[in-house]
């Protein structure tokens, strides 16, 4: 009986250890090719490079707002990348909204590996960019999908 319990405990500890080692791969599912906004069907947008506080350059897509319109900041979900959310930007662009599709480290051809702190840094870089464009917080609409709700 003691041998069976010891075996079960060893198996359990092995499983816990394997999950600990693999947790990042289980948590983040980066993907999506690195395409241009035009190739993705949103020629109104342009690729911007955002420098994060840890020095990484992360690509995002941006279209400025028409006069008096707010800017939608879209933080995408776990699977895929900004290229997979291009169709979600089209209606807002059509109505003159500014749109920023936020890219993340390790997603869509961006350098780095995703992590909680890294994604926060990516989000902070987005906010800093909006400041440089003169877009006040009152004119920003933050939208998060899945993983993006935490950024």
Where are the regions that the model predicts?
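Sparse recognition of residues in long alpha-helices and their boundaries
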Residues: 43, 139-142
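Membrane-embedded segments
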Residues: 53-133, 138, 150
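An N-terminal hydrophobic leader/cap segment in hydrolases
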Residues: 4-51
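Gly/Ala-rich beta-loop-alpha elbow adjacent to hydrolase catalytic centers
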Residues: 143-148
